[in-house]
Amino acid sequence: MADPFAPRTMKRRNVKGLALTPAAPKPPPTAENAPIHRDSDQHAQLEIGIEFNLDLRPEDLEVIKDLGSGNGGTVSKVRHIPTNTVMARKVIHVEAKREMRKRIVRELQIMHSCNSEYIVTFYGAFLNENNDVIMCMEYADVGSLDRVSRVFGPIRVDVLGKIAEATLGGLTYLYAKHHIMHRDIKPSNILVNSRGSIKLCDFGVSGELINSIADTFVGTSTYMAPERIQGEKYTVKSDVWSFGLSIMELAIGKFPFAASEQLSDAESAPAGILDLLQQIVHEPAPKLPKSDAFPQILEDMIQKCLYKNPDDRPTPEELFERDPFVQAAKRTPVDLREWAFGLMERDNRKSHLAPQLSPATADLLRSSDSPTATYHGDDRPLETPTSAYRVDPRRGPAEGSAGLADQVDRLYIRD
């Protein structure tokens, strides 16, 4: 059986005739948020990081819009003018000498060899005139799962299974093939694009970068395993704790630890964070609330991930290969592209700046030809685990459930 995590071959045929310096670059896109999969050329350009090491220069990156910022830096959607490739550019402010920053950039180049369907494509890294570290990577037009959860609420259980499968697949690939631990698993570092692909970003490939910015990301510490908060050694099982916490957050629509509810977005008092970290270390691990929305095998998986003693936790590979919830998720067909379309369509209603789906695409999503046909043209909310999980056999499928009960039944399979 072929190794599912074997790196993709570097000998790829350049079917689109891509060149680093084309004679006539394509004009910039007219729609700022055009879905990736609607342009086959763009899909091919996204593979360019696999075929080439781009000679990235600041003057070749045209900013389309800012995506976010934090203590550690900023992220923008940009267009690489020579290749007309849309990218996500991350500017990281590093407090270090220039030689150390150069070393960080060199360490980041290993990301060129990380070729997996579960990992964002890396285009390159360099230092700008301010000696900031600049990283360019694949742009995910739907966004992070943190944003999806905040805007749309709890994620339904069949999609949650695919998120678990992709996240564990990415963690297993990184460690098995490159001996890299992610070190920062959380919903904001799990991205989704309009093709329905779920991918990891911001993994700990550069030890120097981790050391340089570790003190600037206070929020990340809330996803740290108890052993890391206490200063003990980081292992791949520390990633498993963060994975379990993230999956629970996406399932219930909020951060699982109760102390987090006492922290407002504007509050920066160290006492609030310290109380939360104390709870993570000393209080019992959170559990999924009792609900028909959550199959027992999901509860069991999360419980295994949140054992306080790391020796009791499984590895990402053990979960990916043998956990009943993940195996059931692998067997459950889910149209993630349609799910992603639904999220973007909801966003389109909220902003006149966002592109609208073409009539042909909307008709396709409404038609019975679509595998699950859950797209709605009206304002009905997206299904959540609690609204679409159970079906009364006397009444048949709930309105809008679109076969979700059948998919959840598959998630109960334990063999």
UniProtKB/Swiss-Prot annotation:
Effect in UniProt of substituting residue 114 to A: Does not affect appressorium formation and plant infection
Positions bound to ATP: 67-75, 90
Classification via SUPFAM superfamilies: Protein kinase-like (PK-like)
Protein name: Mitogen-activated protein kinase kinae MST7
Consequence of gene loss (knockout): Produces much less aerial hyphae and conidia and shows weakened cell walls and higher sensitivity to cell wall-degrading enzymes. Impairs the formation of appressoria and the ability to infect rice plants.
Domain Protein kinase: 61-326
Effect of residue 212 to D: Leads to constitutive activity
Function: Mitogen-activated protein kinase kinase; part of the MST11-MST7-PMK1 MAP kinase (MAPK) cascade that is essential for appressorium formation, penetration and invasive growth. The MST11-MST7-PMK1 MAP kinase cascade transduces signals from the cell surface sensors MDB2 and SHO1 that recognize various surface signals such as surface hydrophobicity, cutin monomers, and rice leaf waxes. MST7 acts as the upstream MAPKK that directly phosphorylates MAP kinase PMK1.
Catalytic activity: L-seryl-[protein] + ATP = O-phospho-L-seryl-[protein] + ADP + H(+); L-threonyl-[protein] + ATP = O-phospho-L-threonyl-[protein] + ADP + H(+)
Organism of this sequence: Pyricularia oryzae (strain 70-15 / ATCC MYA-4617 / FGSC 8958) (Rice blast fungus)
EC annotation from Swiss-Prot or TrEMBL: 2.7.11.24
